[in-house]
Amino acid sequence: MEENQTNRQFIRLLEKHAVTESLFELVFERPEGWDFEPGQFARLGVEIPGEAEPQFRAYSIASSPSENDLRFLVKVITGGLVSPKLAALEPGQGVVLEGRAEGNLLPARIPGGSTMWYFATGAGLAPFLSIMKHNAETKCEEREEILVVGARTVKEVEGLVELARRHSPTCRVFGAATREEHELQGRLPLLLETGRLEEHAGRKISKEDSRVMLCGNPECIKAVRAHFKARGIVSPRFGAPGQLLVESLW
């Protein structure tokens, strides 16, 4: 790793795996002493022709703090500046890692309850991979963990579900497809509104017994958050306790 006075480090790609046609799992070397908490994100930058400075984007960390590498999920955005270049990297090539880990998508912020629900779309699965793997390693989470992933096609759903189960064999995982026939079909907000999701999982989501974390497509996450707000499940704010944490990304 190379470091300079601007607190930027060059990190090399070690592995690349295709999760779906447009979602890639990238594994980079981890700088010594670069610490993070499960649920946080890092800023990755790539060189852009004609630009004096690298272009940076925030990506949630998918590895657990105990691992010696940094793992990310990158969804390729058509016309995007950064994601296509990240997805095109090959082992040995690298990116710029800027600063320290950041973010407040931390389970400890919403204590209590008996069930922890994770809702993710696409690359929004990344922070939950980190959290679930850390929990499996440390046995620090006593609440039941349920992960719900949403994607367009059955193939995409299967890729996300397989990745999640590989990181946490004990977590209950459910996948929902929006554009193809599936045992759980429809957008996450609709599946919540109709009660189909809770019926399928065999669990009710309540303010008293449940804690909820959301990460993924901003439009979907906004709708899911509004649904939970109507049920009294809200984020902690100004010292008031809450049951919900949210992070939107593409």
Describe each model-derived feature in a short phrase.
Residues 46, 231-236:
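A common structural junction motif
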Residues 4-5, 81-231, 239-242, 246-250:
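FNR/FR-type flavoprotein reductase catalytic core
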Residues 2-91:
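Ferredoxin-reductase
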